[in-house]
From Swiss-Prot:
Descriptive protein name: Guanylyl cyclase C
Subunit structure: Homotrimer. Interacts via its C-terminal region with NHERF4. Interacts with the lectin chaperone VIP36.
Annotated glycosylation sites: 35, 82, 191, 198, 287, 306, 310, 348, 405
Its membrane topology: Single-pass type I membrane protein
Organism: Cavia porcellus (Guinea pig)
Guanylate cyclase domain segment(s): 827-957
PTM entry text: Glycosylation at Asn-62 is required for interaction with VIP36 while glycosylation at Asn-348 and Asn-405 modulates ligand-mediated GC-C activation.
Locations listed in the record: Cell membrane; Endoplasmic reticulum membrane
A single Gene Ontology CC term: endoplasmic reticulum membrane
Amino acid sequence: MKSPLLGLVVWSLLLQLLQPGLAFWNSQISQNCHNGSYEITVLMMNNYAFQESLESLKTAVNKGLDIVKQRLQEAALYVTVNATFIHSDGLIHKSGDCRSSTCEGLDLLREIARQKRMGCALMGPSCTYSTYQMYLDTELNYPMISAGSFGLSCDHKETLTRMMSPARKLMYFLVDFWKASNLPFKSFSWNTSYVFKNGTESEHCFWYINALEAGVSYFSQVLGFKEMLRGNEELQKILKDPNRRSNVIVMCGTPQTMESLKIDWTATEDTVIILVDLFNNYYLEENATAPDYMKNVLVLTLPPGNSTINTSLSKESLQEFSDFALAYLDGILLFGHMLKTFLRNGENTTAHKFAHAFRNLTFEGSTGPVTLDDSGDIDNTMVLLYTSVDTKKFKPLLFYDTRINQTTPIDTHPTFIWKNHRLPHDIPGLGPHILLIAVCTLAGVVVLILLIALLVLRKYKKDNELRQKKWSHIPPEKILPLETNEANHVSLKIDDDKKRDTVQRLRQCKYDPKRAILKDLKYSDGNFSEKQKIELDKLLPSDFYSLTKFYGTVKLDTRIFGVIEYCERGSLREVLNETISYPDGTIMGWEFKISVLYDIAKGMSYLHSSKIEVHGRLKSTNCVVDSRMVVKITDFGYNSILPPKKDLWTAPEHLRQASTSQKGDVYSFGIIAQEIIMRRETFYTLSCRDQKEKIFRVEHPDGLKPFRPDLFLETAEEKELEVFLLVKNCWEEDPEKRPDFKKIENTLAKIFGLFHDQKNESYMDTLIRRLQLYSRNLEHLVEERTQLYKAERDRADRLNFMLLPRPVVQSLKEKGIVEPELYEEVTVYFSDIVGFTTICKYSTPMEVVDMLNDLYKSFDQIVDHHDVHKVETIGDAYVVASGLPTRNGNRHAIDISKMALDILSFIGTFELEHLPGLPVWIRIGVHSGPCAAGVVGIKIPRYCLFGDTVNTASRMESTGLPLRIHMSSSTIAILKRVQCQFLYEMRGETYLKGKGTETTYCLTGMKDQEYNLPTPPTVENQQRLQAEFSDMITNSLQKRQATGIKSRKPARVASYKKGTLEYLQLNTTDQDSTYF
């Protein structure tokens, strides 16, 4: 069965892709709604279901604008009011079908956003699909007026106004008419019905019948029996069936619909058909006659409106418009009425108040006064017509005012086709027979006598049980502690300590000879009141598979405990938190979730029908899971002993006044259901995380929509929506609108059939299937843990390889130690940033961290392409060595030289984000010689280098020049020895601290490869160089201020937007170094 709810879900996913555009569109609300010029945007879509041309709708809108302008002038308000028509060209969206209107609506929304043509309000769309998605995903902050949108999904939307009767109003009438038993022509209340659906209904009929079909709708919840008839074949079969379960059939259509069915009324004289045909003025015309096939039909329609007081709209001019076009016209008049009201009061028409003001009001429409209820839906008076057997005409039977939900009979002596001119009973074969009345009276007398006798016997039995003290019959010596091997249980959970602590607090014990839980009743003397004794006595006989067994009470030391059945898998809350043992993909699938909800509903249904009557503290921690994966309810029946608490599961009426009720348990079930479905924290909502604030907002609602958890309907599939709607019904603000657990149980049983094909499966089969699922999951979990261990081992290896050289890590893994080693010849590279202190002076600490991180990440990438080892970074210094820990002959000098050239080439292209235009200068020093290396320390071990070679390389860097590679003569000698084609120039004699004066060189490139090296600064004097660099920084800061470049936010540690952030990317800085 295809449901329109599926369309809503599919299109909501599509709409997520357009959120940026819609957000922009949402920001244009005040574009054409101020300074004396006010526009209404009219969204016109090709919907053939209404059989109305766009030109006719434009004519109706323009007619409404003329009236609005006239009324504003009469009120001395001289402003400009216009309409902007938005519609597609019909080239792409050709179907004109309501189900495909969402795509067309999205295109029109983008057109509005692109052209910035949004006015004060939006008129349209008319289809429930597009209206629901626009309201759901765009967070409308302006009034939206719709001529249509009949479906239940558009009910109670804060800024949506509907100008045609929605399905909700129809259901109110049907329920009131079904329950009426004191009308002159109806002596029985009805509780059954068939609903006919042939799949060819008009737009409004489609949504009316769909609402009656929904299992969670008001109509379905109230009726004891309801069945859908799909197609003429099923209808004819039911009409001819003498054992049918109802005489009443609801359908939507026209007299032509009835004629096409070709019903044989001679075989169905007790049948009553309610034909919903609201938008058809044919029945009340003077020359209208009722065909013979309408004699068993009651027609529900809307009477023609009263003549308008506006001389600009005559009856003749209104006849050219259909009800759909008149709804557009009335929408324009409503906009004009609200505009006049706000302008008179000097209020802002773009404010939040204007968007929520289109409700609870009456204005002058095209055919008379129009009233809107507190949800923004139109109220009107429906009329129920019948066919007179005398005149063969349609006559009014009753009026129904949707504003006050009141039925007013018009014809007290109708000339019906039915027997005695009264409507028949809804169940075939029932009626006011004298014999039946006599039997019922006699049975009532007998029942009354038996009831009196039962009450006397019950009172005697109760007093006798209280005297025997059955509620505290367990001697303390029968409560035994658990043995050691029983207390220690194997678990696959990694962090199981918390769970074991929770179990210990519950005081596990052994009783006859089962495991049990001791429930602290918080009484020290054991002197219960008579009410409390009665309450405890009711718990003993309760024995149901979805309830934990209560064994009695016991006094240990000075405290009283209840002895309750133990369930091995803990509470439902713990199971939901355990995502490893109970993953979503296998065990905790939708079928299992529905089964869990059914277990709870089954247990609560039994509990409510038992002597216990009410739970009072139903929550996910009071639902436990046994070894067979059956959910049981516990902690019930102590309402007079344990005072009620204000919890997230507590119903709002009980938060305001501490008490308990069955409807309050239904609310608690709704909160538990949301926990199970979402598998999140209790009462999960994105708008609030504080528990006390949640409880306060539930207890004190601040608007029409009460505060409830999030359900994320837009991501739900078709079958899941039935569950979501049931949950929403369970946490209704009005307790009377919540279903009882019997209805919840039946609804879940039907929903379970949608998820599970084996509908005739026994309870034992279901139980075995659950255990098989759990067993397969354990096997999968063991395999997954093995893979997880291997992945963690490999990740630890990768981390070690980032901290230490690979040979060093291998030695540590194999031997546990790393022997220090002396290397005859290695090449060490040092570099640091010129003017780093000056840059820090003009930068924030976070900007300095960002600068070093961006620079050294790029250095690390260059290092990966050469046979070198990064030793460490010390502040702005970067240290690299080659030739260790793996010796590479004379290649160490070649690799360091090539790496230095690559780094210097990169520096020429690097630019600081917070100081645009400022060049980054580095000094590079390289030296070759012997060196010792080894791992130092146990905690945060370091692979350190020792020797004069390291110090000399550092001196080469500190005495070098900006943007130059300063090399010692030993490195140049190695390069000459291997005959590599490196280009270098002699710098001359350079003084090195601790070594004296030596001849040094500058590496400038290679003969067979071009490097784009930056041009070094020409200033030789150090002081002039520093002054020039300071001027550059000052100019860069002025440039940043002039162009409005903002620095990075200092709230974070560093920016990693140029690369993937992984915990393997480490950056450590030591205060002291072993090299100096």
